């Protein structure tokens, strides 16, 4: 098991950020490379248990909404299938099937900004843990910067 963690301060009010990310199906609106997303079985994007299927960089990914709190400004998702990337992965180093990510927001009172922390924990073979942690440790900042750019376009 391994965990990747990233945090930063976004120069946007908490409610503005939460309004954008609270819908589990809204990934294409703020993550570069996500071209479409669909919630299966007609569930809503804030319903725990909802499954989203989204296309990221040409790869289809399925995740289940495992936790959602409007009061706590957080959402947690869990992988359902092995991650389909990176495409050059060796069959000896399979992609993790079990992983869980959490996006959590807190208000920064000074300047009306938002603290965001994004954690992804992956259940991997011990010999693959560092490789997966390093990958996610580089991807999460990219995703967060994509969110920041999207928010900048909306103001």
Where are the predicted features?
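Hydrophobic ligand-binding cavity/cleft-lining segments
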Residues: 1-42
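Hydrophobic/aromatic beta-strand elements that line small-molecule binding cavities or substrate pockets
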Residues: 6-8, 62-67, 98-108, 120
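A generic beta-sheet turn/junction motif
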Residues: 10, 56-58, 109-111
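Beta-strand elements of well-folded, non-transmembrane domains
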Residues: 12, 83, 105-107, 122-124
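A short, structured loop/turn motif at beta-sheet edges
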Residues: 14-15, 66-73, 104-115
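Hydrophobic pocket/interface hotspot
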Residues: 17-21, 27, 52, 65, ...
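Glycine-rich portal/gate segments that line the openings of hydrophobic small-molecule binding cavities
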Residues: 29, 38-94, 142, 150-154
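A conserved amphipathic terminal alpha-helix motif
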Residues: 92, 115, 119-155
């Amino acid at each position: 098991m391994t965990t990747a963690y990233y945090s930063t301060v976004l120069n946007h009010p908490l409610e503005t950020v939460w309004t954008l990310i609270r819908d589990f199906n809204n990934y294409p609106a703020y993550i570069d490379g996500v071209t479409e997303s669909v919630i299966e079985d007609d569930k809503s994007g804030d319903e725990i248990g909802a499954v989203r299927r989204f296309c990221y960089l040409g790869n289809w990914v399925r995740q289940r909404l495992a936790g959602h709190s409007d009061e706590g400004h957080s959402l947690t998702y869990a992988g359902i299938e092995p991650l389909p990337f990176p495409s050059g992965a060796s069959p000896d180093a399979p992609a993790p099937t079990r992983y869980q990510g959490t996006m959590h927001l807190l208000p920064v009172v000074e300047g009306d900004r938002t603290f965001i922390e994004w954690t992804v924990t992956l259940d991997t073979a011990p010999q693959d843990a560092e490789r997966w942690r390093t990958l996610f440790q580089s991807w999460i900042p990219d995703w967060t910067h994509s969110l920041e750019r999207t928010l900048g376009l909306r103001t």
